[in-house]
Design a protein with these regions (language model features):
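N-terminal, Lys/Arg-enriched amphipathic/low-complexity engagement segments
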Residues: 8-14
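Alpha-helical transmembrane signal-anchor/signal-peptide segments
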Residues: 14-32
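Activation targets extended, charge/polar-rich intrinsically disordered C-terminal tails
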Residues: 170-326
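Sec-dependent bacterial lipoprotein signal peptides
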Residues: 1-2
Length: 326
């Protein structure tokens, strides 16, 4: 009877007790991404770069890349909402000095014939998979072939943050290659792992809240915590972060990653304008104070003529973490 139940593997019950890297994996998940950390350089192995015909018809390509830590410059937070908008897949993309990006996506490692199910994800049905991929692979797959929305949010991470985070992520990938783990829908998924990486570098930087479980809200949560620059209204930031139309326009572009971030310049310009307005407001306040010293015309006049408060900014809570051994 158990053998006829399509929702469970037909292998021994140990399949759901002991995770393993030895299963009949789908073609695009047969290799594990790992890293050789060599002082100030990291050699990333098995970076995936599939060429897709459809979501399920593709040519699998891999390449290795040697990265100097000093070339790591930025970290972007990628959000791919599900049809149920409260849920989303989240990823990190690391920007390098030459304008290219490496994306890290924490996923289930699918066996042949397997599909993702949140319910099965709480019953040790899937192994956890750290995929390091060319950004063109994971973004084009989701926008064109899965018809999903993709949002690319620039974070406030410094280059030092980016290097520390990248090292911690790659050490985790190496760990999973040696000691596999089961994916869990609630406790060991894409978003919870990102949160753990950030909190390892800066303890309690991201409190565990409902926004982590309902990851469709994770970008707003990161915004509220100051991990995304929050000097623009979130809805405006979200609109500028959506890249689907830019992916379509630049699908085959050699500088794909730079072009899909065209609106990041608008984000920076908007932030600069906001900052300049704050400076102008502050300067006006100083001029008014010089012309009308406090108390000269009485409290009533001061209350009526008080200049507006400069708009505050919470940019900067993502402070440079110390490097910690993995």
């Amino acid at each position: 009877m158990l053998n006829g139940c399509s929702t469970w593997r037909t292998n021994d019950v140990l399949d759901r007790v002991i995770p393993t890297n030895d299963r009949p994996w789908v073609a695009d998940m047969q290799r594990l991404s790992t890293a050789e950390i060599q002082g100030e350089e990291v050699v990333v192995k098995n970076i995936r770069n599939c060429q897709y015909v459809t979501a399920n018809d593709y040519v699998v390509n891999y390449y290795d890349r040697r990265i100097r830590l000093e070339d790591l410059r930025t970290v972007d937070f990628l959000v791919v909402p599900f049809q149920t908008k409260a849920l989303a897949h989240t990823m990190l993309s690391f920007g390098l000095a030459d304008g290219t990006f490496l994306c890290v996506s924490v996923e289930i490692r699918k066996e042949l014939g397997e599909e993702y199910s949140p319910l099965l994800g709480v019953s040790n049905q899937f192994e956890l998979y750290y995929l390091v991929a060319d950004e063109r692979d994971v973004i084009r797959l989701r926008t064109r072939y899965r018809d999903a929305e993709v949002y690319v949010y620039p974070t406030v991470a410094t280059p030092e943050n980016a290097r520390a985070l990248f090292l911690d992520v790659m050490r985790r990938a190496n760990q999973l290659a040696l000691r596999p783990e089961f994916y869990h829908t609630l406790t060991n998924n894409c978003t919870t792992n990102i949160v753990e990486h950030v909190n390892k570098l800066q303890p309690q930087r991201v409190p565990f809240g409902w926004q982590v479980l309902l990851s469709g809200n994770s970008a707003k949560y990161a915004y509220d915590l100051g991990l995304l620059d929050n000097r623009l209204p979130f809805e405006e930031l979200r609109e500028l972060a959506r890249v689907n139309d830019l992916v379509t326009e630049n699908f085959e572009s050699a500088d794909f990653s730079r072009r899909i971030r065209a609106r990041h310049g608008e984000i920076a310009a908007g932030l600069e304008a906001t900052q300049n307005q704050s400076y102008a407001d502050a300067e006006m306040s100083e001029q008014d104070e010089a012309e009308f010293p406090s108390g000269e015309f009485g409290d009533e006049f001061e209350q009526e003529q008080a200049p507006p408060e400069p708009r505050s900014s919470t940019r900067g809570p993502f402070r440079a973490p110390q490097f910690r051994p993995g």
